[in-house]
Amino acid sequence: MATNPLSNLDKYEVLLASNSPRRRQLLADLGVTFRSVALSDIDESYPSDTPALDVAIVVARKKAEAYSSLISSNQLIITADTVVVCDGIVLGKPADIDDACRMLRMLSGKTHHVVTGVTVSTASRTEAFKAVTEVDFAQLSDDEIRFYTHNYRPLDKAGAYGIQEWIGCAGISGIRGSFYNVMGLPLHRLYTVLSSF
């Protein structure tokens, strides 16, 4: 039987600080045994002068700081934050269906960036990085936008869409960078960092 390439993590209880079902699935797909945890009162604000492409890493670091005093020496915690940046505007999760439609109209026919900030921390060490993926959206009709927003779950996703859902199949004409980053965790980069612990 072959050894898991991430067996170096066996000395830790790995914690994923996220409620995202996509992040949980992606980390499991990477072969990591972990437990999900989530604090409900983490301040995810950021200074107004933060460059749009740095917002996700700033928020991921704030999440790591919120957990830093709570982890023990045998624990490793992963935090992440994903945003969509279009025309210099940061798009988080939509407030409601109307907001989701507004976001998708903004993305329609344009190239945007999906940025995920990630931290991996133990009691004595923190590694932080961000991944950026360029995503090209085809021109979407109002009917396509309404179909997606009323039949799928855009409200729990940055930029109001999931690349793995119908809109990704029908509306995304190209990507440059990590596909998994668009889903919420840049797995290759995360694997490389986890291998170093």
Predicted regions mapped to residue ranges:
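Anionic-ligand binding patches
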Residues: 2-15, 51-197
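N-terminal G-site helix/loop of the GST-like fold
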Residues: 13-38, 196-197
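A short linear boundary/processing microfeature
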Residues: 32-33, 43, 110, 151
